[in-house]
């Protein structure tokens, strides 16, 4: 167990950050699933804009890796464009 005040605080802060990052990452995964489950092109296009913005913000905050965000956006764009 940690002996110093600063290390105890650092552990506490890292746990809070871990839970926050976990929540945002899960929210993003659910949003991606919602797009992939959509068969309507118009609705998928609207959702794509929101999810794209969300992924960029998460990559900027280092919750997910920048390349992962770009790969997800690319795959989702291909999916949305393939809808009729």
Swiss-Prot record:
Q: Which GO terms describe its cellular component?
A: ribonucleoprotein complex; ribosome
Q: Which UniProt keywords apply?
A: Ribonucleoprotein, Ribosomal protein, RNA-binding, rRNA-binding
Against SUPFAM superfamilies, the record matches this protein to: Ribosomal protein S20
Annotated coiled-coil segments of the chain: none
Report the InterPro entries cross-referenced here.
Ribosomal_bS20 (IPR002583), Ribosomal_bS20_sf (IPR036510)
Query: Short name of one Pfam family for this protein?
Result: Ribosomal_S20p
For this protein, the parts annotated as crossing the membrane are none
Molecular function as annotated in GO: rRNA binding; structural constituent of ribosome
Q: Name one GO biological process term.
A: translation
Look up keyword Iron and say if it applies.
no
**Per its database record, what is this protein's job?**
Binds directly to 16S ribosomal RNA.
List, alphabetically, the HAMAP family matched.
Ribosomal_bS20
Give the family, as the similarity comment puts it: Belongs to the bacterial ribosomal protein bS20 family.
Name of the protein in its database record: Small ribosomal subunit protein bS20
The gene from which this protein is expressed is rpsT
